[in-house]
């Protein structure tokens, strides 16, 4: 393969690799916050520990990886609601209920601000 072909491949593939790494970094950050939280998470009217909920989201992400091209996709397609019932995921943190989607959006925005 000529140098020109290598250069072309490099120029076309690097942004995709970089984007995929950024998505993985941001999603891993969100999952880490869940894992390190003292929150309880409700899905389909059942309460789960932070570890159980994090494992659920990781499993759901792995099963649907091809649908996720951004952290926003992860939030909307994986971490927002039950794929079975359509019910939103809810977090109980420090006595306050919050919708997981809203919590994750706030966390993501804060994470991006602190990294730029």
Set out the residue ranges of the language-model regions.
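N-terminal secretory signal peptides
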Residues: 20-60
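Bacterial N-terminal signal peptides that target proteins for export
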Residues: 1-6
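Aromatic-patch recognition
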Residues: 16, 24, 30-32, 104, ...
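Bacterial N-terminal signal peptides
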Residues: 7-16
């Amino acid at each position: 393969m000529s140098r020109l072909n290598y250069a072309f491949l490099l120029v076309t593939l690097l942004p995709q690799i970089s984007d995929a790494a950024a998505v993985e970094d941001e999603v891993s950050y969100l999952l880490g916050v869940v894992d390190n939280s003292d929150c309880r998470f409700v899905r389909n009217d059942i309460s789960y520990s932070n570890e159980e909920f994090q494992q659920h989201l990781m499993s759901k992400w792995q099963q649907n990886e091809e649908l996720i091209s951004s952290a926003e996709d992860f939030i909307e397609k994986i971490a927002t609601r039950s794929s079975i019932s359509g019910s939103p995921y809810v977090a109980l943190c420090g006595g306050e209920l919050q919708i997981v989607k809203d919590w994750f959006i706030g966390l993501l925005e804060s994470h991006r601000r602190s990294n730029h």
